[in-house]
Structures are given as structure tokens and as C-alpha cells.
From Swiss-Prot:
Xref: Pfam families: Ribosomal_L25p, Ribosomal_TL5_C
Residue ranges with Acidic residues bias: 185-202
UniProt-annotated stretches for the region Disordered: 182-202
Subunit and partners: Part of the 50S ribosomal subunit; part of the 5S rRNA/L5/L18/L25 subcomplex. Contacts the 5S rRNA. Binds to the 5S rRNA independently of L5 and L18.
Similarity-based family: Belongs to the bacterial ribosomal protein bL25 family. CTC subfamily.
Role played: This is one of the proteins that binds to the 5S RNA in the ribosome where it forms part of the central protuberance.
InterPro entries: Rbsml_bL25/Gln-tRNA_synth_N, Ribosomal_bL25/Gln-tRNA_synth, Ribosomal_bL25_b-dom, Ribosomal_bL25_C, Ribosomal_bL25_long, Ribosomal_L25_dom, Ribosomal_uL5_bac-type
Gene source species: Enterococcus faecalis (strain ATCC 700802 / V583)
Encoding gene (name): rplY
Keywords from the named record: Ribonucleoprotein, Ribosomal protein, RNA-binding, rRNA-binding
GO cellular component, one term: cytosolic large ribosomal subunit
GO BP annotations listed: translation
Gene3D superfamilies, A to Z: Ribosomal protein L25, beta domain (2.170.120.20), Ribosomal Protein L25, Chain P (2.40.240.10)
Name this polypeptide is given: Large ribosomal subunit protein bL25
Amino acid sequence: MSVQLEVKERAIRPRSLRNQLRHEGKVPAIVYGYQIESTPIYFEEKDLSKILREHGANTVIKMTVDGKNINTLMSKAQLDTFTGQMLHVEFLSVNMKETTEVEAEVQLIGESAGVKAGGTLAQNLYTVLVAATPDKLPESIEVDITNLEIGDALTIADLPEHKDYEILTDPEEQLVAIVEAQTAPEEEEGTAAETTEPELAE
């Protein structure tokens, strides 16, 4: 699936122009890659926010730059640490027929039998590297943990193959495990050492 983002070209200098754009609710950005020279652009922050909210970060974003209609992926976004405002975004122009690699979120599905029995869920990977043509890139990878008992674990190798994409993360990497809940050790009675004052010789 792809969505359209309206962008406009911008000047690189003066530097104050970028701050002015941000003040107006716009985001300075750059697009580069397949069949396009590195080009500075800008767009309305609310437009990209809506795309990410409704379609995710791995969706193909169409835009028109220098009279060309191109397909892009958002490759990097710089956010303000305190406000979350977009400060700068990089878009990678892609060939829709060539394989592209991205990170996809690991989404756990269900409640494991082991957790219901008192175990603890330990998730070791939160994203995995996947490869696919841009139109087939997944936003997330679903992992069903319903049947996991205490002591069970799932690795990348345990995931079913998917016809649309390939998972490139090491097959031996552990995704999730169900471990016994840790309990605080109880103090044994009588183990506390009592201090006695030495008897004084009369």
C-alpha cells in the first residue's frame, strides 16, 4: 500500500529558514536515492503524522519532486526530545521492484499458558530485520505466545515463513521466553546473629 505526501522544494540556506518552517508547522527534509539527486524539501508535519498514525513507518510514501513522481520510504526522523516535534526527516527513493531492508516491530499475540500459571514473560527482541519489495514490507511481525509454558522459548527460527517477506535476523536469536517468577528468599529463623557484650572479669 502507498500514500501521497505533498512536498515542496526548499533552499538549503539560510539556516534560519529551517527554524522558520518549523515555527509554521512544517518540517524540513531531504529525499535521495533511486533515480533522484539529493533534494531538500519540506512538508506539513500534520500530514506525515497522519500517515504514520494510520499506516505505520514502513508504508510507501509517494511524492512529486522536481516534476518526478517517486516512491519513498521514511529512513530517518529527528524528533525534539521534549516536545516530540519533527525536526528533520530523510526519505529514501526506492525501486518498487527491488528488495529493501527495514526494521519491523515484534508484536506478541495472546497470553501464554506459562504466564497464566505464574511464570514471567521475558521479551528479548522488539524489532527484527526484514527484506521485501517496498509494497510488501510489514509494519510488524506477529508472534503467537499462547501455547508457551514455563521454560519454553521462541527463536527467530521458530517463526513461520512468509511469502511476502524474509526475516534476516539471526535464526538463533531468542525472541521471547517464559521463565519462573523470581521470589524473594525468606529469612530463616535463628539465622540473625545476636551480639553479646563480653563479660568483664571481676
